[in-house]
């Protein structure tokens, strides 16, 4: 969710405007600037919190340390993940202190330390002749493919206010133990935003003497104030400030005029969506493509004035930059909102309707969340679908990235509806948290919750919420030893690393080393990170666990936003070795969601690793027949010998999707696992359809987003697959919403229309193995009506790293299938348990080493009172 480098420059220079008069820039390098408006350079920056630390870094850099690596490890600026890349800058538009600091600095050299309101900055002028700098966004490892040259990848414009909100919260005074109390962080967020808004309003006051306020300063101040309003969705006030910034740019900062024009278009389009209810009661408005490409119900807005203004701004922009694919895409979306796509779109900018459809029809997955009572409107967050009440029915729990936003716990009533029981469950105080997952850490038979906080922002404590088996939860984070140190994280995986029957916990942190906690019999956890060899800093955004080499011990994969990913092979003694390079799975770079799954049913866990390239331009290039320039996600097929093969292109996944939340399931019960990707980034310009990919017999993935009607345009986060109506097929539960309160959105529950194939659900209960059976392997042999047999493989777990499906395994069998045998491998007892005679289309419970199984009643219900699918 962090904004990417070309847009991050706004924060860097806006900080000069946000500063109060008592905290101006300190001029380090004196003398007039020799630059002119044509002096464009590419800059990198490192920002730290003290002058002493900055000077130490200068010494290190001058001694030969790599600037990109130091920026990633030390910088507190939002550009850190990209090695401090600010992008191409016109020097004459910079504040005087920054211009002066760069006087006489040649390409490849450093500036002196510059005091800015967010800290102390070191600038570097990038040398384009240096091969190391020709790919501006190259990851630190040579194994990672670069994004391309700096002119090839166009990052999305920053329009949301999140970067500004993060910066002011970072700088805000903090009381003792602030990172241990979510309510304190909520108060800090509100106070820091209010204080910054007042500072900007004071700076822009007409009563303030004009001395020292250049056109650049005024433009940036208006833009920054607009961002603070946009953060909360106050778009009328935001647009007023953006308009003033645009007028100021036209009069005194011509280099910024086009960017401001695009910002106006994006802001008007966002306001249009808000005014038409697309963020509160969207119905089909946000589903892409709209019915008949914008004609008919659900495809257009009733109030169109702001959409029309957006069109005007986008057209003006495209006259100057006709090859800007991001703005071209937004222009087509704007025409859809007024019901004039494709007929009224200028031919030069039209994205043809033929590019928007699916080649295969999987039926319409209708959103029934409002009818089912899943009435939650929230920012970005995670989702868990599982039985938390012991009723045999799947409940739904969501989290909230907003520092002041609560969790929501919806109890399944068993009649197709859900009732919110957050307060009754004791979860009112669980504010914030971008992601979460479930596990039975104490083996009491009731699923607990791990809530992860601080992802993309300041460090915060996580919360382990023990299920009391009576409909309530108790926060046991401190008691179990998980509260300190507070870290920034949204990535964690549960696994029994030593086969002692207790689930251990891997936490993938961002700016702190990753952590591995050994479960001490359900009473607490011991931090063994250092001795285990996994305490590395890599801005980890996803973690997955599986026994990839089938040696009986679980391994981990860490997906990292900085540098290459890590494949940690279990050494059978509570230590791990990173074998990612030898195994051929360094990842695509800019890693995010990830998971192990057996996509081809050969009995070996394959590996899916996404790349989070925040470029609308790159994501929409296939719609206009262009190949992307940026790095793509990766699908690695397990070769069965400790190595993996990159089959991304071979299976049709060689695209840029901008995925965040993601998970897998079997939408058509054919036995092959499909994928749903939640897309976007915080910017209000990031309007990309979420993506549903159907697995065709383990040989290809086909995009069925359009035919399924699951292409929600707003930000997709936690994803889960689950059969919520007990009719034998999996629904898709998608937590939708951006990173700011002004981009909140309702949850989506896409009801599966059914495909006529058979299925079985297996609820495994560990006895020696952990009670939830996480890590147990299932091999199910089926015979079709022609007498041919095949094997279907599953591993018990909640799925992907961002969103959690039920631990009860739903397995599609295909059409007219007969179950020949179910074989379960239990890790702790190291036994293979075979069950024969199972009927299809039912749910059964199988306990470890038991001689029989139990059939569980799962009565089909009607979601939201609608007629259930046959």
Describe the residue ranges of each PLM region:
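Beta-propeller blade termini
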Residues: 380-390, 411, 432-446, 489-499, ...
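Peptidyl-prolyl cis-trans isomerase
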Residues: 57-97, 127, 131-134
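Hydrophobic beta-strand segments that make up the repeating blades of beta-propeller
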Residues: 383, 395-400, 445, 449-454, ...
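Short coil/linker segments at helix-helix boundaries
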Residues: 180-187, 210, 215-216, 233-237, ...
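Gly/Ser/Thr/Pro-enriched helix-cap/hinge segments flanking short amphipathic alpha-helices
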Residues: 651, 700-870
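Short, conserved, GDST-rich strand-edge loop motifs in beta-rich repeat architectures
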Residues: 273-301, 452-457, 610-628, 677-686, ...
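Blade-edge motifs of beta-propeller repeat domains
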Residues: 343-378, 410-431, 465-487, 518-538, ...
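Proteostasis/folding factors centered on peptidyl-prolyl cis-trans isomerases
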Residues: 28-45, 73-74, 97-136
């Amino acid at each position: 969710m962090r904004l990417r480098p070309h847009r991050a420059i706004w924060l860097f220079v806006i900080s000069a405007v946000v500063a109060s008069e008592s905290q101006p820039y300190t001029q380090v390098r004196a003398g007039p600037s020799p630059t002119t408006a044509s002096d464009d350079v590419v800059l990198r920056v490192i920002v730290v919190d003290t002058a002493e630390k900055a000077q130490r870094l200068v010494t290190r850099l001058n001694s030969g340390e790599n600037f990109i690596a130091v920026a990633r490890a030390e910088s507190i600026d939002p550009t850190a993940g990209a090695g401090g890349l600010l992008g191409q800058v016109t020097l004459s538009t910079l504040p005087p202190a920054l211009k002066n600091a760069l006087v006489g600095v040649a390409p490849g050299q450093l500036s002196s330390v510059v005091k800015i309101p967010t800290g102390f900055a070191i600038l570097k002028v990038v040398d384009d002749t240096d091969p190391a700098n020709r790919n501006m966004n190259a990851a630190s490892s040579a194994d990672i493919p670069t994004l391309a040259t700096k002119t090839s990848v166009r990052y999305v414009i920053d329009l949301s206010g999140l970067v500004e909100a993060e910066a002011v919260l970072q700088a805000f005074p903090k009381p003792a133990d602030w990172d241990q109390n979510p309510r304190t962080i909520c108060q800090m967020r509100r106070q820091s935003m209010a204080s910054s808004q007042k500072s900007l309003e004071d700076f822009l006051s007409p009563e303030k003497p004009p001395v020292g306020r250049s056109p650049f300063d005024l433009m940036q101040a208006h833009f920054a104030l607009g961002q603070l309003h946009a953060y909360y969705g106050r778009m009328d006030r935001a647009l007023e400030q953006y308009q003033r910034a645009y007028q100021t740019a036209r009069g005194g900062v011509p280099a910024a005029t086009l960017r401001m024009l695009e910002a106006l278009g994006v802001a008007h389009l966002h306001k249009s969506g808000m005014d038409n209810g697309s963020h509160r009661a969207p119905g089909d408005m946000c589903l892409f493509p709209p019915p008949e490409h914008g004609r008919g119900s659900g495809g257009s807005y009733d109030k169109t004035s702001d959409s029309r203004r957006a069109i005007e701004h986008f057209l003006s922009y495209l006259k100057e930059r006709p090859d800007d694919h991001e703005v071209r895409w937004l222009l087509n979306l704007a025409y859809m909102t007024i019901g004039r796509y494709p007929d009224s779109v200028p031919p030069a900018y039209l994205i043809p309707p033929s590019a928007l459809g699916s080649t295969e029809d999987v039926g319409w997955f209708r959103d029934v969340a409002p009818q089912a009572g899943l009435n939650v409107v929230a920012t970005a967050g995670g989702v868990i679908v599982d039985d938390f009440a012991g009723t045999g029915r799947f409940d739904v729990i969501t989290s909230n990235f907003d520092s002041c936003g609560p969790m929501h716990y919806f109890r399944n009533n068993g009649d197709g509806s859900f009732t919110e029981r957050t307060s009754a469950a004791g979860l009112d105080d669980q504010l914030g948290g971008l992601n979460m997952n479930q596990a039975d850490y104490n083996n009491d038979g009731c699923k607990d919750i791990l809530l992860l906080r601080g992802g993309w922002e300041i460090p915060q404590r996580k919360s382990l919420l023990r299920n009391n088996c009576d409909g309530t939860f108790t926060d046991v984070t401190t008691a179990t030893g998980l509260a300190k140190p507070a870290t920034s994280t949204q990535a964690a995986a549960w696994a029994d690393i030593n086969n002692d029957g207790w689930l251990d916990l891997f936490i993938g942190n961002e700016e702190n080393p990753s952590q591995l906690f050994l479960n001490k019999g359900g009473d607490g956890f011991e931090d063994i990170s250092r001795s285990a060899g996994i305490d590395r800093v890599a801005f980890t955004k996803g973690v997955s666990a599986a026994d990839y080499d089938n040696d009986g011990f679980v391994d981990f994969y860490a997906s990292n936003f900085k540098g290459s990913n890590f494949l940690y092979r279990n050494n059978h003694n509570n230590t791990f070795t990173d074998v990612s390079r030898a195994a051929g799975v360094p990842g695509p770079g800019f890693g995010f969601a990830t998971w192990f799954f057996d996509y081809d049913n050969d009995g070996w866990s394959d590996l899916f690793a996404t790349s989070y390239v925040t470029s609308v331009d790159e994501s929409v290039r296939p719609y206009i027949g262009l190949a992307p320039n940026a790095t793509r996600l990766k699908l690695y097929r397990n070769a069965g010998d400790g190595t993996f093969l990159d089959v991304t292109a071979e299976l049709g996944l060689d695209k840029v999707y901008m995925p965040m939340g993601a998970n897998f399931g079997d939408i058509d019960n054919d036995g092959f696992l499909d994928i749903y990707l939640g897309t976007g980034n915080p910017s209000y310009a990031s309007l990309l359809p979420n993506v549903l990919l159907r697995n065709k017999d383990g040989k290809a993935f086909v995009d069925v987003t359009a035919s399924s009607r699951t292409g929600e345009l707003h930000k997709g986060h936690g994803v889960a697959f689950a059969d919520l109506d007990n009719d034998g097929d999996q629904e898709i539960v998608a937590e939708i919403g951006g990173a700011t309160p002004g981009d909140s959105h309702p949850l989506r529950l896409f009801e599966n229309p059914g495909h006529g194939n058979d299925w079985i659900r297996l609820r495994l209960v560990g006895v020696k193995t952990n009670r939830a059976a996480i890590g147990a392997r299932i091999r199910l042999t089926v015979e079709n009506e022609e007498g041919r047999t095949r094997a279907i493989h599953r591993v018990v777990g909640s799925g992907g790293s961002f969103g959690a499906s039920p631990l009860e395994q739903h397995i599609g069998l295909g059409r007219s299938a007969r179950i020949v045998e179910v074989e379960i491998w239990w890790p702790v007892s190291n036994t293979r348990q075979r069950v024969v005679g199972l009927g299809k289309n039912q749910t059964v419970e199988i306990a470890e080493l038991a001689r029989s199984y139990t059939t569980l009643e799962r009565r089909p219900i009607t979601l939201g009172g609608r007629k259930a699918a046959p």
